[in-house]
Every structure is written in structure tokens, then in C-alpha cells.
Amino acid sequence: MLIAIVGKPGVGKTSLLQYLKDNYHFSVFYADSFIHEQYQKNNPGYQLIMDHFGKEFVNQTEVDRKKLANYVFSDDKLIEKLSLVTKPLLIAWIKSLKTQFQKKLALIEIAVMLNYWNEYRSLFDYVIKLERDDQLVNLALQQRNSHKKVKDLIKEPNCKIDTIFNNDSIATAALKLIKLLETFLERNKCRCDCCHIQ
């Protein structure tokens, strides 16, 4: 069973999934990390960036992510282009995880899904959106020196999504998420041992 974890930058998606992995032994995956792996030389993402954006955005070993980010953040059309270029890689990866986790539970952080709902939604059994007060989001983005435009990259969904608010401790958010996952498993009447939450 694949569960998508979505939300705007700075809401704590990565921290929450890491906490669940460390403390509850969940299988967790990160779309951004997958794409970063694909940006290594001899991987498909490296060639795609070179083909679609030019040789100036790659070096001897990998895509120059900082240079690429500075370039694409200057224009919404370039952000869209980058997403379209990497989308086939992401979809193939998610499909392989779907096969691998047919009888297991896995959480995948994929913020960009909210911008391409129709392409990604059918790949997941459930979607959970993480939200946080704006003041906490701004603080989180400042602490990691994120580009100012990052906050607005992810669109608000135009449909109802199960939502968890991450305004307290990460442990509190984790317990909320686990409770929601338990309702999903009950809804699916999942009986396999590997899907039970410990």
C-alpha cells in the first residue's frame, strides 16, 4: 500500500517521515532524493538535464543542482519544464514501488504531486496532506535558507485530502498520522501482517 505525503515546503514532511522511520520502522521514500540520485552522471536524469537545459547545468559527476535551481526559479515556465522533464522518471519509480509494496505499507514524500494531481493520484492508495501555520513555515524555510519563491511552488489542491496539522511536536504529528493510517488499513480491511502498524 502506497501512501503519498504531500504539502507545501516547510510544513515538516521530511522530518515527519524520518521520525516515523527511526521510531516506528516505517518504509519511507522521498521523491526529491530519488531525483537527486537520477542527477548523478550515467543516470537518466543527468542526460535529461543536459538535453533539455544545456551542458552548463552539469559537471563531471552530476547535475549542478544549485545552478539549475537558480535558473529555473527565475521563471514559472522553466519550473514547469523541469517538472515535465523529470515526471516520467518519477512515475516509473513510483510504479516500481507500487509493485514492491503490494502487501506492505510505504510512505512517499512527493510534494510536486499537488501540481500534477491527475498524473500521480492513481499511483497511490491514499494521500495525506501535511499543513502548518504560516509563521512556522516561514521559520522553517529561513532555517534552511530556502529560496524565497520555494514557498509558492506547490499549489493548493482543489479537492478534499485527508490533512494533518503539524503545529506541535513532530511526535504529536506522527501519532496523528499513525491514527489516520490505521483508519486506512481498517477501510481496506487489510489482514496481512506486514501492513499492521506496530
Swiss-Prot record:
PROSITE patterns: DPCK (PS51219). Pathway: Cofactor biosynthesis; coenzyme A biosynthesis; CoA from (R)-pantothenate: step 5/5. It is found in: Cytoplasm. GO terms for biological process: coenzyme A biosynthetic process. It catalyses: 3'-dephospho-CoA + ATP = ADP + CoA + H(+). The keyword Kinase applies. ATP binds at G10, V11, G12, K13, T14, S15. GO terms for cellular component: cytoplasm. GO terms for molecular function: ATP binding; dephospho-CoA kinase activity. Keywords: ATP-binding, Coenzyme A biosynthesis, Cytoplasm, Kinase, Nucleotide-binding, Transferase. InterPro entries: Depp_CoAkinase, P-loop_NTPase. Residues 2-90 form the DPCK domain. The keyword Cytoplasm applies. Its EC number is 2.7.1.24. Signal peptide: none annotated. Catalyzes the phosphorylation of the 3'-hydroxyl group of dephosphocoenzyme A to form coenzyme A. Belongs to the CoaE family. This is Dephospho-CoA kinase. It comes from Mycoplasma genitalium (strain ATCC 33530 / DSM 19775 / NCTC 10195 / G37).
